Amino acid sequence: MVIGLSHYLTVSAILFTLGVFGIFLNRKNVIVILMSIELILLAVNINMVAFSSFLNDIVGQVFALFILTVAAAEAAIGLAILVVFYRNRGSIAVEDVNMMKG
């Protein structure tokens, strides 16, 4: 059995759906929301690499590496902000984060 484009798109659609459900169904934990955003970015990367490989073009794969770099930086900065917020407030609930003054 050959793994084709439709298999990659199916896996990507499942990951994207899990990420969207994670954001909409969990409104209390910021870490789970951050992980759901990472799942969505991973699904987009799988799509880009699958189409790039299917079309024999390297540009999509290079762009996917840039997206992974941005996602890693976003996760690191987001977790650092959450650690500082937890030290100051003692909680990382979404309701507490919404009360921040800007």
UniProtKB/Swiss-Prot annotation:
As recorded in UniProt, its EC number(s) are 7.1.1.-
According to UniProt, the reaction catalysed is: a quinone + NADH + 5 H(+)(in) = a quinol + NAD(+) + 4 H(+)(out)
Q: Which Pfam families match?
A: Oxidored_q2 (PF00420)
Q: What are the transmembrane regions?
A: 5-25, 31-51, 65-85
Q: Name one GO biological process term.
A: ATP synthesis coupled electron transport
Q: Keywords, A to Z?
A: Cell inner membrane, Cell membrane, Membrane, NAD, Quinone, Translocase, Transmembrane, Transmembrane helix, Transport, Ubiquinone
Keyword check for Flavoprotein, yes or no.
no
NCBIfam families membership: PRK05715.1-2, PRK05715.1-3, PRK05715.1-5
Assembly, in brief, is:
NDH-1 is composed of 14 different subunits. Subunits NuoA, H, J, K, L, M, N constitute the membrane sector of the complex.
User: What HAMAP family does this protein's entry cite?
Assistant: NDH1_NuoK
Spell out the protein name for this chain. Answer: NADH-quinone oxidoreductase subunit K
The species is Rhizobium leguminosarum bv. trifolii (strain WSM1325)
Q: Which gene encodes it?
A: nuoK
